[in-house]
């Protein structure tokens, strides 16, 4: 019995220790912000929320949260928000596409297609 207990304890010591999630946590008037922080144990998501005052002006807020619900900005409403969620190390660092960027995609594709 003690032999089995010893094997169990040795195997248990070999398991990786769970580490707290790290996210960028900040609030910024502009495109993006980066400030890494270790999240509390109860926080299992990194969240990025962009509140649009106009299609070109926004406030970015990044945080650690215990639960997260993703939303999409429609590109037209004032004071509307878009929220993205993720669950791995510093996953909320990169920005996501803004309505202005998305509007350029068809023009770039048309230009590329005309060159062929």
UniProtKB/Swiss-Prot annotation:
This is Ly-6/neurotoxin-like protein 1. It comes from Mus musculus. Disruption phenotype: Mutant mice show no gross abnormalities in size, viability, CNS morphology or longevity, but demonstrate enhanced performance in learning ability and memory and are more responsive to nicotine. Aging mutant mice exhibit a vacuolating neurodegeneration that is exacerbated by nicotine. A lipid is attached at residue 92 (GPI-anchor amidated asparagine). Its main location: membrane. GO terms for molecular function: acetylcholine receptor binding; acetylcholine receptor inhibitor activity; acetylcholine receptor regulator activity; ion channel inhibitor activity. The gene is Lynx1. PANTHER family: LY-6_NEUROTOXIN-LIKE PROTEIN 1 (PTHR16983:SF27), UPAR/LY6 DOMAIN-CONTAINING PROTEIN (PTHR16983). Disulfide bonds join 23-46, 26-33, 39-64, 68-85, 86-91. The keyword Lipoprotein applies. GO terms for biological process: regulation of neurotransmitter receptor activity; synaptic transmission, cholinergic. Acts in different tissues through interaction to nicotinic acetylcholine receptors (nAChRs). The proposed role as modulator of nAChR activity seems to be dependent on the nAChR subtype and stoichiometry, and to involve an effect on nAChR trafficking and its cell surface expression, and on single channel properties of the nAChR inserted in the plasma membrane. Modulates functional properties of nicotinic acetylcholine receptors (nAChRs) to prevent excessive excitation, and hence neurodegeneration. Residues 1-20 form the signal peptide. The keyword Signal applies. Expressed in neurons of multiple regions in the CNS, including the cerebral cortex, thalamus, substantia nigra, cerebellum, amygdala and hippocampus. Also expressed in kidney, heart and thymus, but at lower levels than in the brain. Expressed in the primary visual cortex (V1) and the lateral geniculate nucleus (at protein level). It is found in: Cell membrane; Cell projection, Dendrite; Endoplasmic reticulum.
